[in-house]
Amino acid sequence: MAFAQSVYNQSSVLKINVMVVDDNRVFLDIWSRMLEKSKYREITVIAVDYPKKALSTLKNQRDNIDLIITDYYMPGMNGLQLKKQITQEFGNLSVLVMSSDPNKEEESLSCGAMGFIPKPIAPTDLPKIYQFALTYKRNGKSTLSTEQNQKDANVSVPQQIMLVPEQAYVLKTKKKNCSSKSDTRTVNSTNVSHVSTNGSRKNRKRKPKGGPSDDGESLSQPPKKKKIWWTNPLQDLFLQAIQHIGYDKVVPKKILAIMNVPYLTRENVASHLQKYRLFVKRVVHQGRFSMLSDRGKDSMFRQTHIKEPYVNYYTPSTSWYETSLNNRSFYSESVHGHSRLLSEAREPVRYNQMSYNYMNRNISFENQPSQNEETRTVFEPPVMANKISQTSQVLGFGQLGPSAISGHNFNTNMMSSYGSLTPNQPGTSHFSYGMQSVLNNENATYNPQPPANATTQPNLDELPQLENLNLYNDLGNTSELPYNISNFQSDDNKKQGEEDGDWTFVNINQDQSNGESSNTIATPETNTPNFNINPNQNQGQAVPEFTDWSFLDQQELVDDDFMNSLFNNDMN
């Protein structure tokens, strides 16, 4: 008898009574047949086509109904209003809302519905509905007591039941109230294998702080400490205290005593002191790193070279350009007492006497006189010429070779030379004799005193001549010369000139009958209207400079490409 009673109780538990409310009779019939003819034979469907009829049915069969499924759109009363009315009259019953509008899902769940079923219903939804209803029946349709509801009256998040993960799209929970009168409830699941609640371990309601816990123990927490804002006046007091005590001897207790601020505690000062020490350590580290990095920098970056530029007072000797052809490195002198080694060894030459900025490579040459005129051997004009040439330093040019004479560098009463051709420099010939007097006094009449061994022509007696300038004798028996000079004939009373390209060869012969050698001088032809070497003209004008070619290498004199490139650079 007892065994039969237990079997009956077990079978009664597996039987589920579901009430379906829908105003569409066709859908209601299909829905009822699907539930009844499913493999779950224990489901009994109560079909109702009107909301008010559903309320009357609940009055008669309240204890026999385990689950209510209602449509959202119905005449006279929608599904949410029906759910609210059922809650007011019959307590908390499980209600599922179904609708073809997916936008009603959130509203339904927020108003207390246990789940939402989209229309049309698929056959896969049937087992989920059965499991949902079975869970409620096994729990004995348990709801929270009145006391529990009163305690949770201020809780806005209802605890709702969710099915297994595959049923997540059917039943969802939202944390929102439908109205101020909606009841809240919590249903605890005992079948963990099938049902999980939103009030799981993560979302279980926390009891107020200081209230009784589940084991009866009260956990009292200390109040939170008040946060201290270190304002500027408070920070000034803190720094003054550190300065008074000393950074090495400072401790929080002494700082607190000196500051004498009532609301400060020792912990506040200790925390702030620790942060301050970390800040000081970081500043010191950055300072050391910057000092090590600046040690390798050039000293010119630490000087005021932009506002007060450096000036070179050295005598210009090779070129007025800032670099020579071979990029030889020179050092300039600072007028502010700084080191001369302001530039690196690879820095190009800045060898002029005008003020310039080290950071600006495009310097402009101003019209300035030399600062050390007493040491010059070549006249420097007070006004620069319009065109500046650069003397080559290849094979001694510029030091001992010919000066690059531009056609626009000669004025009426002065001549500009770019070669430092003094007798003190080593070389095969010194032809600055007779030039010093006219260069030092440009307005004086040029009357040179040639040396005893210099050979002159009677018609060119006022021109400075060079000694031992026989180019043919210096080259020996070389068969190839850069220019043919065999056609020049000696003449005692006049000079012969043959123009070959841009160069004029002048043959000066004094007396070949006496066995003396003739001198052949090659000079660049200048087309300036202000330059004239006619001896009959006024000798107060500037006289061109004659250069010596005898010291050059024979192979390079034979090379036409070398000579043409050299002449073109000098003439340009």
From Swiss-Prot:
Top-level taxon in the UniProt lineage: Eukaryota
CDD domains: REC
Residue ranges of the motif Nuclear localization signal: 224-227
Name of the protein in question: Putative two-component response regulator ARR13
Localization: Nucleus
Gene symbol of the encoding locus: ARR13
Family of the protein in this entry: Belongs to the ARR family. Type-B subfamily.
GO CC terms in record: nucleus
Chain residues forming the annotated DNA-binding region: 227-277
